[in-house]
Amino acid sequence: MKNIKTNSKYLKKHDLFLPTSRVIEKEYLKDALKKKASAIISDNSINLKADTYPKLDIPIIKVPDRYKTLYQIYNDYYNDPFKNCFLIGVTGTDGKTSTALMIKNLLNNFIKTSYLGTNGFAIDKLKKTTKNTTPSIDEILRYGALTKEKDGKALAMEVSSEGLLNKRCEGLSFDVAIFTNIKSDHLNVHKTWKNYLECKKLLFVKRKKNGYSILNKDDQHFKEFKKVNKRNIITYGKKNATYTFSKVRIVDNRTIFNLKHRGKSYLVNSPYLGLFNVYNLVAAIATVHLYVPSLPLIINACASLPVIEGRMQFLDFKQPFKIVLDYAHTVQATKVVMDLARKIAKNKIIVVVGCAGGRYKEKRKEIGKIVSYQADIAIFTMDDPRFEDLNSIFKQMTCEAKNNVILISSRKKAIHKALEMAGKDDLVLVLGKGCDSYMAYQDKLIPYSDYEVIKNYCKRFKQ
C-alpha cells in the first residue's frame, strides 16, 4: 500500500481506496479496479455483492464504520494533532466565517491560533486554499498537524451542516462548540427543515463532556441547541444572557457597543460594522474568555482586529465612492447587508449580485426583491452558474423585482458597469462571492476574483 485515497479520481496503483461520499457510485469502484488499488475499505453502507461487481477481484476490508476508520488511520498518522491543541467549532446559517476568524484573530493575541473554513487555512503568514468550508477528516487532521508544527495551541474552524451530513468531522471531539443562528437555507441539500436542524445540532453531540457550548440566546431555536449538551452552557444576546450587549451604534465606520458580563460593563470598539457583527464578535469574546481570564485585555484587543476578507470589506483604491465586498448569499445575510447599507450610505446604492446555479432556487426571488427594493440600481449577474442556464436564474431573480434592474451575464462586466456608474459618495456593494478565487462553470472551477476585478478597474483612480 502506498497511500490512502478517499476520491477515486486521485487513485494510483497500490493505493488503498476508502470512499467517503454518502452515495458510492458504481463508477468509483470501477475506477478502483481499473487503477489497481491495493484494497477497498467498506462498511455495510456499500453494496459490494459479487453479482453487482463480478470483476471486483481486489481485497475488500470490511469495517463497522468507514468514516471512523478513516479518522483512526489519519489521527494515528498525524500523531493525534488535537491532543494538546484546542479545537473550536462554529456552526450556523450565517456568521460562521466571521466568527471563526474573529476567534482566530482575537485569541492569537494570547495563544497562537489557526483558522480553517471558507477562507481556507491560515496560521501566522501561511495561507492555503480549501475546496470546502469543512474539508474531509484527513484534511482537518492534516491542518491540525500543521497547526502543531507551527507551535499553534488552538484551531478555530467552521463546521457546516453539509460537512456534518457527509461525516467529515467523524471522530473529532470539540473543546468549544458555537452556534450563531439558523435560518431556512440549504434545504436543497437537507430536503427538510428538521433534517437541517438535526444536522446543525450534531456539532454539540461532538463536544467534549468537559467542553463548552456557546449559544446565541436571541435565536428562536436556542432551546433546541441547549438540549443537546446541557452542561457548561454559555449564552450571548441582548438580555438575560452570560454576555449581553446594548447601545449599538456606528461611528466613523466602526461599531461601538456596551458589553455586560457578571454585573460589569465594558465599552467595545469594533472594526466590524453592523448588529450581526456584534453578535459574531460577542461570541468570539466569550470563546476567548475561556482561555484568557482578563476580559478587559480581550476587549482592548478588539479595537485593533484586522479586516475580514470578503465580509463587509471596505476597499480603498483612492476612488471617490465606497466599495464593499461581501459574501452574503443567503436571504437573511442579503437583507442584513442591505439594511446596513441604507444606514451608512450617503448617496446612491449600486449593488452587483447573482444567485448560484443548481441550488437554492427558492431563494432567488427573495434575494432579487430585497436587493432591488433597497438599492437605487441593482445589477444582476452570474454567480457560480454551474450547468444552469443564466436566463432561467435571471427570470427567477427578477419576477418580483422593481424596474431598477440591469442584467449583465459577465460578472466582470457587471462590476465594471457598477463602478462606471458610481459617483461621489455613492456606495457600491458587490455581493455573493466574497474572497472566492474561482467561478464554478459547468464542471470546472475557473480562476476568478471579485477583488482582482475591482482592483484592476480602480487603477485609473491612482493616476
Model regions: which residues?
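Acidic, Mg2+-coordinating active-site environments of NTP-dependent enzymes
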Residues: H14, L33, I46-K49, C85, ...
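Short internal beta-strands
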Residues: S38-N44, S213-K217, V352-V353, I377-D384
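Structural beta-sheet core signal
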Residues: Y115, M157, A177, L215, ...
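ATP-dependent carboxylate-amine ligase
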Residues: Y10-L16, S21-E25, K230, A286-G310, ...
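Short glycine-/acidic-enriched loop or helix-start segments at secondary-structure transitions
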Residues: E27-K30, K49-T52, Q72, T99-A100, ...
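Phosphate-binding loop of NTP-binding sites
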Residues: T69-K217, H221-R231, A345, K462
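N-terminal leader/targeting and accessory segments in enzymes
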Residues: M1-Q72, D76, Q220, T244-R249, ...
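Short secondary-structure boundary segments
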Residues: D43-S45, V159, N181, K217, ...
